[in-house]
Amino acid sequence: MLNDLPYLSAGEGPPLVVPLYTPQAANPRGLARWSTMRLVRPFTEHFTVYVVNRRPGLPPGTTMTDLAAVYAQAIRTTFEAPVNMLAISTGGSIALQLAADHPGLVDRLVLAGTACTLGPIGRRAQRAYIERARQGRRPSPALAEVVTESTIGRRLLEGLLWLSDSGHEDHTDAAVVLDAEDGFDLRGRLHDIKATTLLIQGDKDLVYPLELARQTVEGIPDAQLVVYPGRSHSGTFTDKRFAPDALAFLTDS
């Protein structure tokens, strides 16, 4: 445990902290673990990568500020700050909040598939996920809307996502995190971020639309934006250009 936070580590070199969001407040298992490690593997040639999840048992009403404070304390007690960070999707929201609230802890920050607040489709889908979780229903089908705009594709994906939920998992913690992100809006705080920042975004991202990504970069001093045409939310950080672009930024002296 990293200051009581579950984490996976791999590689050699200076630390690269990756705040992770998964439905369960634990190290990912099975396919989720494989896909997570596949994402960070290129970075292990240059860094010791720490994939860090949240602490289980989050109280209702937890905010992004609260989550960022937990990660900040873990960084302070574990590393010689500041550290480099790599963050995607909801993990990017946590990283942005951390970089604004604790600017001395982050040196270089690479973000992907994220922004300073949720877009309307992402917000609607996550609220539906939260409601289903609170009702004890399998929540993942609510996320089909953020994957495809096709009605037929959405219906098919809803079925697959329903099957992927075992029905035995507790999604309470996940709902608390997404509820925190629902209230997350950093547009008035972006100037507080001092980290050297790169945001990589697909122009077809339905969760965090490109316009919000542009606002994010415009608000952070000297931040850079790289746009992948035709790429969706998840397609951004699975694109073959992602690791080389991120590594070039992180290792640029």
How should these model regions be labeled?
Residues 1-59:
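Conserved HGGG/HGGXW glycine-rich cap/lid loop of the alpha/beta-hydrolase fold
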Residues 66-84:
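Conserved acidic catalytic loop of the alpha/beta-hydrolase fold
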Residues 87-91, 95:
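Gly/Ala-rich beta-loop-alpha elbow adjacent to hydrolase catalytic centers
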Residues 96, 100, 108-136, 173:
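Flexible "cap/lid" loop of the alpha/beta hydrolase fold
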Residues 120-122, 139-184, 189:
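Conserved alpha/beta-hydrolase catalytic His-Asp/Glu region
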Residues 193, 199-201, 205:
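Short beta-strand/loop motif that positions the catalytic acidic residue
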Residues 206-212:
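Conserved alpha/beta-hydrolase "acid-adjacent" motif
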Residues 223-253:
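Catalytic active-site module of serine/aspartate enzymes centered on a nucleophile-bearing elbow/loop
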